[in-house]
Swiss-Prot record:
This is Methylglyoxal synthase. It is an enzyme of class 4 (lyase). The gene is mgsA. It catalyses: dihydroxyacetone phosphate = methylglyoxal + phosphate. The active site is at 71 (proton donor/acceptor). SUPFAM superfamilies: Methylglyoxal synthase-like. Substrate binds at residues 19, 23, 45-48, 65-66, 98. GO terms for biological process: methylglyoxal biosynthetic process.
Length: 151
C-alpha cells in the first residue's frame, strides 16, 4: 500500500480507554499525569470518560460505553485522523463480551499508525516523550491512492 504523511499537532488528541478491572489503574495514571494531559484534547469511552472527568476535573469528550459502540466510535475517529494516540489499559486475563470490537479497535490503530500504550510503563514513556509537545509527522496509508487503484 502506498503511504503518505499526516502531521500530529503539538496539542494531541488522546483517547483514554480501560476495561472495568483497569479503570482504577487508568484513573491513578491520569491523576499522576494530569498536568501533562491538560494541554491536550482528551476522548474516552463512556464509563471511563465519566469517571476520569468526575475524579480529575479534566475536560474529556465521552463517547458511548465500549460495549455499546464506543470502541467502534473511537475506531472511526482514528480512521478519520482525529485521534493522535491512545492509552488503553485492557484486561489481558479476562475476556469481555465485546472482544471483537476491542480487536477491531487495536487493528485500526495499527493500520493508521496510531501510537498505543497498553500499560503504565508504555504510557509513561509515551507521555514523557519530547514529541508530546511538538508537531510530529507520521506515515499513514494513502487512502486516495488506495481508492484510485480499486476503482
Amino acid at each position: 500500500m502506498n503511504k503518505t504523511t499526516r502531521v500530529m499537532p503539538a496539542h494531541k488528541h488522546i483517547a483514554l480507554v480501560a476495561h472495568d478491572n483497569y479503570k482504577p489503574e487508568l484513573l491513578r495514571w491520569v491523576k499522576e499525569n494530569k498536568d501533562a494531559l491538560q494541554g491536550h484534547f482528551l476522548y474516552a469511552t463512556g464509563t471511563t470518560g465519566r469517571i476520569l472527568s468526575k475524579e480529575t476535573g479534566l475536560a474529556i469528550k465521552s463517547l458511548l460505553s465500549g460495549p455499546m459502540g464506543g470502541d467502534q466510535q473511537l475506531g472511526a475517529l482514528i480512521s478519520e485522523g482525529k485521534i493522535d494516540m491512545m492509552i488503553f489499559f485492557w484486561d489481558p486475563l479476562n475476556a469481555v463480551p465485546h472482544d471483537p470490537d476491542v480487536k477491531a479497535l487495536l487493528r485500526i490503530a495499527t493500520v493508521w499508525n496510531v501510537p498505543v500504550a497498553m500499560n503504565r510503563a508504555s504510557a509513561k514513556f509515551m507521555i514523557s516523550a519530547p514529541q508530546m509537545e511538538e508537531e510530529v509527522s507520521i506515515e499513514i496509508p494513502d487512502y486516495d491512492a488506495y481508492l484510485a487503484e480499486r476503482v
